[in-house]
Amino acid sequence: MQDTSSAINSVYEDTKDFLIVGLTGRTGSGCTTTAQKLCGDEFNIPTDGYDGLTRNELKKHQIIKKYLDGVEWIPFYKIEASGLITYQLLQLSKSEFIAYFSSQTFGNPLSQKEASSLFSALESNRKKNLTARNKHHIQEHEIDTFFDFHFIDIPQLTKIIHSRLGKAKFTQFYQRAGDNVRASGRANDQNFNPEQLFNFPKHLNFLIKLAHKKARANNVPCRIVIDAIRNPYEAFYLKRRYANFYLVSINTTNTERLRSLREYRKLTDAEIKILDNKEYPEKISGAKKFVVQNIQECIEVSDIHIHNSKISEYTQNDLVSQLAWYVTLMMHPGLVMPTSIENCMQIAYTAKQSSGCISRQVGAVVTDESYSVKAIGWNSTPQGQLPCLLRSAEDLICGRNKSDFSEYELTNPTFRKALASKYSNLIATNKSSNRNFSFCFKSIQNEIEGEKNQVHTRALHAEENAFLQISKHGGQKLLGGVLFTTASPCELCAKKAYQLGFKKIIYIDPYPGIATQHILSAGKNKPELELYRGAVGRAFYQLYQPLMPYKDEMELIFDIPSFENPEKPSKSILKKENAALLEANKTLQMEIDSLRLIVSGRQP
């Protein structure tokens, strides 16, 4: 039994020994607090979880707590994105450093004298011979030196810069420098260089490998938390390289987020507006997609969503309980089952892959009050019309596949002129391209009208599609039900949901419009709005699919004896008894034969 128990431990060794958690979320949501919890020497899980847990969920929480309490807690290594920016600032010469710090236009920029003083404070660390050209060939005797520089010295230098600049100015300065690093590989150069596209995640990758070397040298598991990932391509880079990488979004209500920014970070409303415009830009195009912060898309592609209610600044029971839940499942998949809410949102997440929209994919699920699924939907064109992803501007310009297009698209001269001006030369000069030239009707029509009109979209919204599926196929009661959406309802879908009488709307990413404040918060039958907490996508299966049936695992770890009821013996027991009797008969027969030989005077 000891051998099989050791074998089970070996099965889970990879999941326990190497974990990477990348945090994402808007400033003020709690990413830094989450990282601090994971990096602590202790991880104290509340016995009763947090408010709102169902009876089954409380049972699962207790199983999670028992598991984590029964193993030694290993603190996570923390990689701060701000540290990567500090490292790039250290690569600047003195003149470049002073020029860059004193040239910023926001707030009150540092004077050249102040910038020179700051440079002097960092000078001793700049002299350490830890440059990009030798960091990829770390010898075993150099591990501690490199580790101390990147995981101890750099964070301390970041704090020095933070104290000199102040909170608001530091945030703006580092966001801009971070964009520059993503664009050019240098903190003071904003010109886009495609060869430096993955400079940021490659540096993250180096630090991950460095932490792994350090952990192996110390003979301890390697667990890493990254605070925080702000561009989705950084997450994609790491997801492709590490099976045990999880992107975790930390979310809170906008009210709590704003309160945190005002009370704890002491930001003014003007500074908060600048921050929000930076993290949630209205539209990102061209090379900026690879450069600027895009928190909305980071949240969309997250593997795990954690709701930080911020009910108490002292206990943070809900945050700690959720972290415990998912860290445990990362180490031991399938220890508990998913919640009903996770099951429903996973269906919505799967449904969104059916969307033919070339701008954004959204999925929705409608259930009754017991989470019994009644309909699913995704944003796409009405049944019978071809989704935008499958249509081609080349076909429309050349007059092919006319049934794919509307009469307006085929005959309106202004629209055809606009389409041709955008795509004719593009198609002609890229004949060898292997891409389908799909186009967005709404975008072209809005360019013609010089407006931003959402009415021109060809697709039904995911929530709207789910509502219509029910009425289309016979109709069912929805009053008191629950709406799940991988985004959140717009103003139009919010009104429909309100009219249908949903008691709860569970969403992942807040819609930037006024649907919540203006529509869903009015009247006497207001639905409850709940930020989603749970796993989705590949993480759902990776966390909840056990490596082997739990019964088999228990039997291999523990020597569980069988119970034998003498009054109702099982077939296996009877077989054992028959075999024993048969063996006894053989022995007895041999003794009888031996006695016969003795009696007859012959020796046996």
Regions found by a protein language model. Name each.
Residues K59-L122:
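P-loop NTPase motor core
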Residues T32:
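Walker A/P-loop
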Residues L210, E234, E263-S321:
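Small-molecule kinase domains that catalyze NTP-dependent phosphoryl transfer to phosphate-bearing small molecules
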Residues C39-D41, G70-V71, F236-Y246, K495-K504, ...:
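Short, surface-exposed basic-aromatic patches at helix termini and helix-loop junctions that form
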Residues G49-E57, G83-I85, I250-E256, I311, ...:
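Short, acidic/turn-prone active-site loops that include or flank metal/cofactor-
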Residues D227-I229, L238-R265:
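Conserved phosphate-donor/acceptor-positioning beta-strand/loop module used by diverse small-molecule
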Residues F97-L118, K128-A211, A287-V291, Q296, ...:
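Zinc-dependent deaminase catalytic domain
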Residues M1-T27, K37-G70:
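Extreme N-terminal, non-catalytic leader segments
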